[in-house]
């Protein structure tokens, strides 16, 4: 069976992220990617996880407690992902974005292309060669299609000599299945 967007994002990250690496979860949400990344980098690595909603930080802490998983290698940051460079000075191996709204949260609080593109630019600037920035774009909500279009325009215009860009989507599914974009630094 083909991987769904979330499964594929995890596969793409697990191919490059190693114990001891520094990674970013740009949209913490319910904490599932943060937990996954924490396992990948292990105790010697670091996960910087961002969200503008305090509810996301609470749900992530709860998820870690429920899984009896330490937060020692994780920094939960109550800030927009366009503040990454304010908090992360290290070179990063991977970054993941789940764009849209917090599942189970306020559907009027959504990601926006301006802050997302700024955050992606920051991740790319700090990415090591071979590092990957993953964007899982949920676009079935108001404002979602506009964000997707602007992100596609941004990613399409990246220099092919510096980055390889992948688009992964299911083209025969209804209800706006998420589209995954992967940007890998080449040099």
Predicted regions and their residues:
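S-adenosyl-L-methionine
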Residues: 1-21, 35, 39, 57-93
